């Protein structure tokens, strides 16, 4: 209790002392968008572009909700089939291939990331899985477990034992029959998804530190960050549902910096929380709207991007913020809308090049490549 109180006091103090609290205006960063970026085959449609990432060669990976869905709902499981698709394009936007077609863990796409070795990681919210592909497109690691693909009925209640059925001559003093058997015993309770450890419940994103440790944003229902070693062995997790520091309400996006600090987009609490590599709370940034996507650039001077992208019923302004890692806002760009250079719920950002970023949009069903001009911000 005392530790929680100390964390809260520290967070409040950092907020009032931080440059965020003092900033009254944010410069607008000019930018351009490349028209008709992705060249799709005639029979292929993109769908909701929930994930976008690039590799060291400039190839573009897009994780989409493109297929038709088939939902079967059990009493404690929901099974959704055939909605995730993963496409690869070259650096010019030319279509290269589809990866993982028909994969058992592809159900409801959420994000895609490319690690420093050019492995491709997809996060599937529907299957509760994180899946790693090597650059050739082979599955080399799976984390989490897909819920059962069949209906899971509730165990029937036990039948009450009926009264004994008597036969023969009652006057003889003994029953002529035996008591009827009881019905079948109830099945043991089944655990739902999201048990502690490496079982996820609607995970959303993944990141790595320099040692290769894996951080999974776990996500909608577990309200935690789970840490694994480079081989996928579970180490620890932190977080719970709530509004205090180190608590979350939809862990929607995650990134790490060169020092191994972990930045978590706490979407419904409308803040970014920062932790050290072991999950100890460090800071929070609270004036960048609802962070649907965060991305940290590589290189010696790292920048943090965060998208403020609520849905159509609560759109906000739809802008993207460019920040220092300490939370100082350097500028913003974009607004909600359907035209080029406007955004329809930016769900993921790729920022391998700090001034050339890719954004995947849900409601506009597209990916935009943006060229920023921060030196012209005003």
Which residues fall in each region the model found?
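Bacterial N-terminal signal peptides
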Residues: 6-19
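Positively charged n-region of N-terminal signal peptides that target proteins for export
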Residues: 1-5
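Eukaryotic scaffold repeat domains enriched in small/polar residues
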Residues: 21-378
């Amino acid at each position: 209790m005392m530790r929680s109180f100390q964390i809260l006091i520290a967070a409040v103090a950092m907020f009032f002392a931080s440059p965020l609290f003092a900033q009254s205006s944010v410069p607008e960063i000019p930018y351009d968008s490349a028209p008709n970026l992705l060249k799709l085959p005639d029979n292929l449609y993109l769908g909701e572009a929930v994930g976008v990432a690039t590799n060291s060669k400039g190839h573009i990976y897009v994780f989409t909700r493109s297929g038709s869905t088939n939902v079967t709902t059990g009493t404690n499981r929901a099974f959704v089939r055939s909605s995730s698709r993963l496409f690869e394009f070259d650096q010019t936007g030319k279509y290269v291939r589809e990866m993982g077609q028909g994969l058992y863990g592809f159900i409801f796409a959420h994000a895609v990331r490319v690690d420093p070795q050019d492995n491709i990681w997809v996060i599937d919210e529907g299957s509760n899985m994180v899946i790693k592909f090597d650059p050739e497109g082979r599955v080399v690691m799976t984390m989490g477990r897909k819920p059962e693909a069949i209906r899971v009925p509730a165990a029937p209640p036990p039948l009450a034992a009926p009264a004994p059925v008597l036969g023969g001559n009652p006057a003889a003093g003994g029953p002529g029959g035996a008591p009827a058997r009881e019905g079948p015993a109830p099945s043991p309770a089944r655990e739902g998804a999201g048990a502690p450890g490496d079982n996820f419940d609607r995970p959303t994103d993944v990141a790595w530190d320099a040692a290769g440790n894996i951080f999974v944003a776990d996500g909608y229902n577990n309200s935690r960050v789970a840490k694994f070693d480079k081989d996928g062995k579970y180490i620890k997790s932190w977080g719970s549902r709530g509004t205090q520091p180190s608590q979350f309400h939809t862990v929607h996006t995650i990134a790490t910096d060169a020092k191994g600090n972990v930045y978590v987009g706490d979407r419904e609490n409308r803040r970014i929380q920062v932790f050290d590599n072991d999950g100890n709370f460090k800071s929070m940034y609270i004036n960048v709207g609802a962070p649907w996507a965060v991305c940290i650039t590589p290189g010696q001077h790292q920048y943090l991007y965060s998208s403020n992208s609520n849905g159509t019923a609560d759109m906000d302004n739809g802008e993207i913020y460019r920040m220092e890692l300490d939370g100082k806002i350097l500028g913003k760009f974009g607004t909600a809308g359907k035209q080029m250079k406007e955004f329809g719920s930016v769900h993921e950002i790729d920022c391998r090049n700090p001034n050339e970023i890719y954004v995947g949009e849900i409601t506009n069903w597209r990916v935009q490549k943006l060229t920023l001009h921060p030196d012209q911000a005003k």
